[in-house]
Every structure is written in structure tokens, then in C-alpha cells.
Design a protein with these regions (language model features):
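Nucleotide-sugar donor-binding catalytic core of glycosyltransferases
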Residues: 4-7, 11-19, 57, 61-194, ...
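Membrane-proximal helix-turn-helix segments that form the acceptor-binding/catalytic region
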Residues: 23-25, 42-56
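Short beta-strand/loop segments at the ligand-binding rim of alpha/beta enzyme cores
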Residues: 27-36
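Nucleotide-sugar donor phosphate/pyrophosphate-binding loop at the beta->alpha transition
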Residues: 35-49, 85-90
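A charged, aromatic-enriched C-terminal amphipathic alpha-helix characteristic of glycosyltransferases
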Residues: 237-269
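Non-catalytic N-terminal targeting/anchoring module and adjacent flexible stem/linker
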Residues: 273-281
Length: 281
């Protein structure tokens, strides 16, 4: 319902924030704290800054953007990082083993934007030639050739799946791939990474400051095609006990530290409201 009603679209005036402004004004009249969380930082900071400026509290996935926010909104508005998390009701481990001895990737591929991210994807895909990779294309419904994946004999492209079904994919495939669009942030990482780990999946990811800080002990971080080929060359023979132990430890770690309950608690502390205990994460 909020699609095209939060970000700025200068060339599409019918896409505007009028409804959002009314909601924030109504909440403020009632003394309800107004909190904005930008999960699209730092790539799309400028598309959301106008909307963010309406709020009493601003959270961002990318800590690097905090000075930019402070420059715009001033000291009266609190700005803090708020990282991605998982919903355990959807993303959680299973005792069943994997069904497919391949890699999977759930997400998009773009020829016209995010060149660095695309290079990392192509490196991972090349490394998977020994085991094959199945892609679930987030942009399968878009007709533009800019969103088409490369034509590789070991890469199979399937239509997009609902977010709630991604968990089963991470459980079903032996390996799940991850790329991070933002690499220089200690708080920004792909949400996909924590969702893979929460499901007990074996994650193979590209590097980033946040990966090094939080996830390097629970995933394989590959930095070049040679490393990727060596890793997948081993994995084609199946998972080792160390692989399984690392995946299990990753699920335990994420579910202990990276759920939406944890993030809501951070928000409530920031606005000085008591946190009601609940079994729902």
C-alpha cells in the first residue's frame, strides 16, 4: 500500500509523499513518536531524505549515512543505525538435510546499475561451474533486458518466489550465495545473508566490513574467483562436518542476536518506551 509513497520521484509527480505527511502529522497531534527506518541506505539516501526529515527519530542500515542525516535534520532529531534482522517464524533451521547438491541465489542482477555488485555476482557464478547454481530471479516479472542474468550452461534461472518461500530454498540447497551492494559499512549487509544463516544454510558471501565484523566465523567469505573455484571444487563432494557445524553455529548466532525483536527493542530504547516481552520475534 505504501509503494511509491515514501521515496522521491522527481520525474513522476503522481508518486508523492502526501499521504505519508498526513499520517505523520496525525500521529504527532496525538503524541505518538514517529520513527523512520531507511533500509535502502546508503545507495538511495537522497531518494528518502525528504521523507525521513518528517520524523522524530531516524534509523538507517548504513552507519556511514548518519553524518549526512545530521547535516540535514540537525541535532533535534536522533539518528542511529539499525541493522537488518530475521523473523524466526519464517527463517529458522530445519533438521532435514539439503535436497539439492547445488548452489542457489535469490535476488536480482542488473546490467545498468551496481557495477561492483555485478562483478561480485559474476565471480561467484563462475566459481560455481563445478556444482551449478539455480537463481530465483527477483526481477523475473520485468521485461527490460537490463535485468537478465548471464547465459551460462551451469546457471538455471527460475521465476521469483514470495519472500516467505525463500527460507525453504536456503534449507533445500547445499549452498546459498550472497552478495553485498554496500561493502564499506560496518552495519550494512544484505538481509539475505542473515536469512540464509538463520535457516542453517551454508552461506558463501562476498566481503564487506560488516561481514568481517559479524559473520566471518559463520560463512565462507570469498574475495576472488580462485578462492571461489577452490571452495566449490571441494563442496562438489558434499559438506564436511566442519561445514555443518559452522552452519548450525550461524543459525544459533543469528537467532540470538539478529531478530526483529532485537531491533524493536533498540527502537523502543531510543524513544524511551518500555519493551513488552513477547514470544514472537
Amino acid at each position: 500500500a505504501w509503494k511509491y509513497k515514501i521515496a522521491a520521484y522527481p520525474d513522476r509527480p503522481e508518486r508523492n509523499t502526501q499521504t505519508l505527511r498526513k499520517v505523520v502529522a496525525s500521529a504527532r497531534e496525538r503524541g505518538i513518536p514517529c520513527v523512520f527506518w531507511n533500509r535502502e541506505d546508503g545507495i538511495h539516501f537522497h531518494r528518502f531524505i525528504s521523507s525521513a526529515s518528517l520524523f522524530d527519530y531516524i534509523f538507517t542500515v548504513d552507519q556511514n549515512c548518519i553524518p549526512q542525516y545530521q547535516e540535514v535534520v540537525g541535532p533535534a532529531v536522533a539518528v542511529a543505525p539499525l541493522m537488518f534482522a530475521v523473523q524466526p517464524a519464517i527463517h529458522s533451521p530445519s533438521t532435514d538435510g539439503y535436497r539439492y547438491p547445488q548452489a542457489c541465489f535469490v535476488g536480482s542482477y542488473s546490467l545498468h546499475v551496481h557495477g561492483g555488485r555485478r562483478n561480485w555476482q559474476e565471480m561467484l557464478f563462475a566459481g560455481c561451474s563445478d556444482i551449478g547454481v539455480t537463481v530465483y530471479d527477483r526481477n523475473s516479472g520485468r521485461s527490460s533486458p537490463n535485468y537478465r542474468y548471464p547465459d551460462l550452461p551451469w546457471l538455471q534461472v527460475c521465476p521469483s518466489v514470495p519472500h516467505t518461500q525463500t527460507a525453504q530454498l536456503y534449507r533445500d540447497y547445499m549452498v546459498s550465495l550472497n552478495v553485498n551492494t554496500v561493502e564499506d559499512s560496518v552495519t550494512m549487509f544484505s538481509r539475505r545473508l542473515v536469512e540464509i544463516l538463520a535457516c542453517g544454510g551454508l552461506a558463501v558471501t562476498t566481503p564487506g566490513l560488516s561481514v568481517d565484523r559479524y559473520f566471518k566465523d559463520y560463512s565462507y567469505v570469498v574475495r576472488c574467483e580462485e578462492e571461489a573455484r577452490d571452495l566449490f571444487g571441494r563442496l562438489k563432494h558434499g559438506l564436511t562436518s566442519r561445514d555443518r557445524e559452522m552452519a548450525a553455529a550461524g543459525a544459533e548466532y543469528v537467532l540470538k542476536e539478529f531478530t526483529w525483536t532485537h531491533r524493536l527493542e533498540e527502537v523502543m530504547r531510543a524513544i524511551s518506551r518500555p519493551v513488552k516481552q513477547s514470544s514472537v520475534a
